[in-house]
Amino acid sequence: MGPWWALWLILTLPQILESQISAMSQGFPQMTSFQSDQFQGEWFVLGLADNTFRREHRALLNFFTTLFELKEKSQFQVTNSMTRGKHCNTWSYTLIPATKPGQFTRDNRGSGPGADRENIQVIETDYITFALVLSLRQTSSQNITRVSLLGRNWRLSHKTIDKFICLTRTQNLTKDNFLFPDLSDWLPDPQVC
């Protein structure tokens, strides 16, 4: 690959991934503003679906907490904590705001050259109860789509869970792609989707 081709790829890939998020969140209104100061704080990850997950992965992961700390330049330092047996695993990363409200790019500077690019979009939130988050990551071998359902407490309304299911459907995710909660018998309200 010549230098001009590499330059073209570097300059156009962010726009391509950004347009994928817009197209892939169809059926949900585009955010016109995003209040970072209201979004910051502790959230519980109560729903997680991913096109690379399978039913057999459910035993490996469970509900976890995530803390969004607002830093300078409207960046978020994100710290996740999950218990596995008697251990608590934590991992962190930085989200850099993109051009659209509620859209971010995951900072991979410490990951070395050729690190995967990940675009993250808050699709919908009321800031006090729930948030629906869509993540798209391009690796060298596949596109990874992840949908997360965040809650400020451990209980969510049926309508919110229905919205989560509807968003996963727009991403062509099936019930087999759900890590949690187990929604194999859940039938969402057809008026929500």
Swiss-Prot record:
Cystine pairs annotated here are C88-C193
A single GO molecular function, which one? retinoic acid binding
Has UniProt tagged this entry with the keyword Disulfide bond?
A: yes
Instruction: Output a single Gene Ontology CC term carried by this record.
Output: extracellular region
Q: List all annotated glycosylation positions.
A: N143, N172
* Stretch forming the signal peptide: 1-19
Per the record, the similarity remark reads: Belongs to the calycin superfamily. Lipocalin family.
Instruction: Identify the main location.
Output: secreted
Question: What does this protein do, in the record's words?
Answer: Binds all-trans retinoic acid and may act as a retinoid carrier protein within the epididymis. May play a role in male fertility.
Answer yes or no on keyword Chaperone.
no
Pfam families in UniProt: Lipocalin
Q: What is this protein called?
A: Epididymal-specific lipocalin-12
Alphabetized CDD domains for the sequence: lipocalin_12
Residue ranges the record marks as coiled coil: none
Found in which tissues? Answer: Expressed in epididymis.
State the UniProt keywords alphabetically. Answer: Disulfide bond, Glycoprotein, Secreted, Signal, Transport
Top-rank taxon: Eukaryota
Where is the protein found, in the record's own terms? Secreted
Its source organism is Mus musculus
How it assembles, according to the record, is: Monomer.
